[in-house]
Amino acid sequence: KVRAVAQAASSAGIPIRIGVNAGSVRPEQWQQFASRPEAMAQLALQQAEMLEDAGLSAIKISLKSSHIPDMIAAYRRIAQLCDYPLHLGATEAGTWFRGSIKNAIGIGTLLAEGIGDTIRVSLTDDPVREVEVAKEILMMLGLRHSGWQFVSCPTCGRTEIDLIALAQKVEQALALYEPQRPLTVAVMGCVVNGPGEAADADLGVAGGRNGGLLFVRGEKKGFYPESELLE
């Protein structure tokens, strides 16, 4: 059956993705190798060899695990062993908060090392949020050349405006529009670090007493009261 599928895919010019999911590996298969990452890599290569023998060379590989250190190590290992395109993902990552962190660490680490060709963020959530997290990972690594880069500070004793509320409202407003090139928006809380960060952004605010300075592409446009900063 595998040979028939491989031959049909080859004739139609359709690639096949080999997916090794840690949750589907049998106990006796783990025991054949020195480590779980090694097992995942070798099992994928065994399947790739089977497809190659059947005449299919258009192959992509994914090695997914909910244990992020194993996932990272498995992809590093497979990258050493073959030149097949790699599809990155962390399986069973969980709900939005923890799952986003897992995906960002696992996928982001590998992409930063130059490993990986496509990605899939998995969350127990709306698929739209999966896409949003994936876009942010690519954006943070400079691999996506459109969308918003949003900068805001953690607040400190110098903050004199309700920065948290302002930052949340700005982020919500930005979600309604996606620019075709990277644009940076900075919402900063004080007059010490704020002006520099705000001036470096395409659009920035540096908070002060009862309001803030507005910068557009490094140019100071004026001081506005806190109630008008969002507008």
What are these regions (language model features)?
Residues 191-220:
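Nucleotide-binding motor/catalytic cores of P-loop/tubulin-like NTPases across gene-expression machines
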Residues 173-185, 202-203, 209-214:
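Catalytic-core signal marking the mid-to-C-terminal active-site face
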Residues 215-231:
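Generic C-terminus detector
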Residues 1-33, 39:
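Active-site-proximal beta-alpha core segment in soluble small-molecule metabolic enzymes
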Residues 18, 61, 110, 153, ...:
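Conserved, mostly hydrophobic/aromatic
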Residues 29-176, 180, 184:
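Catalytic alpha/beta core domains of metabolic enzymes, predominantly
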Residues 1-2, 96-99, 214-217:
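Short, charged, surface-exposed secondary-structure boundary motifs
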